[in-house]
């Protein structure tokens, strides 16, 4: 009996309703269906009383999800896809992401096209697009305090009402550099269209094997976004702040103290996205972010000669 998974956003009633309906339909068609919510992929935040919230990378896979599963249907928005990625990437399960959220930059299709999408996926009429992930670790000495898989980005920044941060950052075996800024972002190509883009980083096509380091509000004109090979690990040391905040993929993180370091490297795991049509990254940029649209003059209240 073929296996399929369903991961849904349990905060959205429509996603939960569709998940149950889809489970019944696939079960009746002879599929072994495992269903879970994306809450299992949410990392959670630590608090000052408990500064470390440890989430083992291999501990997020839901019961019933394994490498024998043909694919997993994800019902939600981009946040749900980010959480689901951590749940299934260690098993190599492909994701068919159905948008029930807002922008849906990472999703493949919309809810009103769900029946056709399921039929096409069951028939095997799709391509697989792999997206690189990061392994993020917080180390104190050689002890791992916290670790997580990351599809978009890791952000390390100051707390509100605190002064500017200094970071000592070493990329690979290159000489460390000092960056003065409100924070720093290390992102994958997938994350280049998220927080990194808003902070002034470049857009990187998904298949390019690079990472990027983007300062947040740097205190120097010389501190600009850096793109480097994803074979280079990154070590980040806080220099002058009692405590920093680290956030991974916008949905979890922990506090970083002066005695800690943040270590990042390309993960051996990747996310496998089911593409029902040949992937067209520039088309998605155009549709979702308005990239490359022709400039249209805005109407003016002044009549020009």
Curated annotation (Swiss-Prot):
Xref: InterPro entries: ATP-NAD_kinase_N (IPR017438), ATP-NAD_kinase_PpnK-typ_C (IPR017437), NAD/diacylglycerol_kinase_sf (IPR016064), NADK (IPR002504)
Localisation: Cytoplasm
UniProt xrefs under PANTHER family: NAD KINASE (PTHR20275), NAD KINASE 2 (PTHR20275:SF13)
Catalytic activity: NAD(+) + ATP = ADP + NADP(+) + H(+)
Purpose of the protein: Involved in the regulation of the intracellular balance of NAD and NADP, and is a key enzyme in the biosynthesis of NADP. Catalyzes specifically the phosphorylation on 2'-hydroxyl of the adenosine moiety of NAD to yield NADP.
UniProt GO MF annotations: ATP binding; metal ion binding; NAD binding; NAD+ kinase activity
Keywords (A to Z) from UniProt: ATP-binding, Cytoplasm, Kinase, NAD, NADP, Nucleotide-binding, Transferase
Gene: nadK2
Organism: Nostoc sp. (strain PCC 7120 / SAG 25.82 / UTEX 2576)
Necessary cofactors: a divalent metal cation
The protein's name in its UniProt record: NAD kinase 2
Superkingdom: Bacteria
Family note: Belongs to the NAD kinase family.
Signal peptide positions (record): none
